[in-house]
Amino acid sequence: YFESIKNKSNDDFIKKWHEFTKNPKRTTNDPMEAHVIGFAMWVKAVEKVKSTDPDKVIDALPGTEVPNLTGGTSKMLPNHHITKPVFIGEVKGDGQFNVVWKTPGLVPGDAWSNYLPDSKDLEADWVTLKCGNYNKLTKKCGGSS
């Protein structure tokens, strides 16, 4: 996420942020966009299950899609990570970014790296496996004996 990405949803968010902070130079950042996405997903899940019961909301989150601030949508995956576009930018003189490359579509978030020895055999799947660190070799959820 870059504040300098131009579209209506991002422009509206930045305007509200500047009004809230009473500082037109205050910048936004990726963790702020993540909060916007996460809260919108939580609201949608609460509305779906008509409850704020944490277990019901958690079960309703996978598959939830909401707009992101870069002009597309983000989706909650069974591993409780989301899809997002990836941007590479170069810094401008004002500290903002020019986008020099972006993914053609959304990139799925992954809970575990396939490249690290300690995590390459782990899988997160809260829908089917009900586990965030399932070992595909031992067929056990982390923490269980």
Predicted feature residues:
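Extracytosolic ligand-binding ectodomains
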Residues: 1-145
